[in-house]
Structure formats: C-alpha cells, structure tokens
Amino acid sequence: MSLSTEKKAAIVAEFGRDAKDTGSSEVQIALLTAQINHLQAHFSTHKKDHHGRRGLLRMVSRRRKLLDYLKRTDLAKYSEIIARLGLRR
C-alpha cells in the first residue's frame, strides 16, 4: 500500500529544490497526495477496510495542515503546488 522507492524519488525530483530535498513542505505535500490517490483506488475495491480509511483521513489532515502552513508562509508556492497537483483548495 505504500509508494515504491522509484515513485518517491521521482516525486522528490519533481517537487524538491534539489535531489535530496525530502523535508520541504512542497515535497511532503506531493508525497502525501500520491499516497492519498493510491489509497483512494484501494478503497474503491475494499469498501470495508475501516482501519485503512482511518489512516487515509490522518494523511488528508496532515496534508491540509501542511498546505495551511505553506499558505501562511509563502502564498506563491502554495498557489503553484495547488495548481501542479490539481487540488481544489
């Protein structure tokens, strides 16, 4: 249920400031979005996986908090990442 190492590396390369930038808010938001999208596909077939759904809600909450932080600190990066990820905030 987790992302592969190659997929994570591609996301870090696309959204990070350099190849080893894994801690910036932009990268964390992009990784959480990829994981959330992966889990949404899982829940379309496994409707009664309530334990996994709880983890999904936790990830969504964490992403929302990171997006709020980014909006508060750097509005331009917030707008850019919303557009690049296709989020509807």
From Swiss-Prot:
UniProt name for this protein: Small ribosomal subunit protein uS15
Pfam families: Ribosomal_S15
Positions of transmembrane segments: none
Protein family membership: Belongs to the universal ribosomal protein uS15 family.
GO BP annotations listed: translation
PANTHER family recorded: RIBOSOMAL PROTEIN S15, BACTERIAL AND ORGANELLAR, SMALL RIBOSOMAL SUBUNIT PROTEIN US15M
A Gene Ontology term for the protein's cellular component: cytosolic small ribosomal subunit
The keyword Transmembrane helix belongs to this UniProt entry's keyword annotation: no
GO molecular function: rRNA binding; structural constituent of ribosome
Assembly notes: Part of the 30S ribosomal subunit. Forms a bridge to the 50S subunit in the 70S ribosome, contacting the 23S rRNA.
PROSITE patterns: RIBOSOMAL_S15
Cystine pairs: none
